[in-house]
Amino acid sequence: MARYTGPAWKLSRRLGISLSGTGKELEKRPYAPGPHGPNQRKKLSEYGLQLQEKQKLRHMYGMTERQFRRTFDQAGKMPGKHGENFMILLEARLDNLVYRMGLARTRRAARQLVNHGHIMVDGARVDIPSYRVKPGQTISVREKSSNLVVVKEAIEVNNFVPEYLTFDADKLEATYTRHAERAELPAEINEALIVEFYSR
């Protein structure tokens, strides 16, 4: 399944969750798009709830189904709770951590920064958004890219960096000090439903 590249606001309304992280998509119209508007939402079956939760998380991180399932399977081989491990692996993606650092206003914009070669890990350029960052590694912006308008604008509006990142705004770099804990990850996601979906 290909990565969704359509309007993010429309997908946010369909899934009932803000994919941009701003919440603006749902402020005026907190219902699915289309002619039926607010009357379109209906009670979902157990399978429908599981599928919806899976789609919410997959689109939140901007992944293809193949990437998403592969990460899910990898999480299943780790000790501990499958669902929590899955969330932790998703959070460790390079594009996501660039977003968490505040270098981009959305994960989609962060993915573009990585794709275009603006981001470095431990001093080496990495242009793979799905690159899994390990604790202790440092993420930074290339010197040639430090004056990008999109980066400066993003930093100006960002007022929160999670505790598992130590961010130096002057150097535009952060160290991924540890894996995130479940309490620090999206509370609106019920990962147990996703485990149930793939366990059918």
Curated annotation (Swiss-Prot):
Any one biological process term the GO annotation gives: translation
Q: Tell me where in this chain the S4 RNA-binding domain is found.
A: 92-155
Instruction: Look up the coiled coil feature and give its residue ranges.
Output: none
GO annotation, cellular component aspect:
small ribosomal subunit
TM spans (from-to): none
Q: Which InterPro entries match?
A: Ribosomal_uS4, Ribosomal_uS4_bac-type, Ribosomal_uS4_CS, Ribosomal_uS4_N, S4_RNA-bd, S4_RNA-bd_sf
Residue ranges of the region described as Disordered: 22-42
GO terms for MF: rRNA binding; structural constituent of ribosome
* Leader sequence residues: none
Q: Does the keyword DNA damage apply?
A: no
Gene3D superfamilies per record: Ribosomal Protein S4 Delta 41, Chain A, domain 1 (1.10.1050.10), RNA-binding S4 domain (3.10.290.10)
User: What Pfam families does its record include?
Assistant: Ribosomal_S4, S4
Supply the alphabetized keyword list: Ribonucleoprotein, Ribosomal protein, RNA-binding, rRNA-binding
Q: Which CDD domains match?
A: S4 (cd00165)
Q: What does this protein do?
A: One of the primary rRNA binding proteins, it binds directly to 16S rRNA where it nucleates assembly of the body of the 30S subunit. With S5 and S12 plays an important role in translational accuracy.
Task: Provide the family line.
Answer: Belongs to the universal ribosomal protein uS4 family.
Q: How does it assemble?
A: Part of the 30S ribosomal subunit. Contacts protein S5. The interaction surface between S4 and S5 is involved in control of translational fidelity.
NCBIfam families membership: PRK05327.1 (NF003717), rpsD_bact (TIGR01017)
Protein name per the record? Small ribosomal subunit protein uS4
- What does the record give as the organism's lineage? Bacteria, Bacillati, Bacillota, Bacilli, Bacillales
Q: Which gene encodes it?
A: rpsD
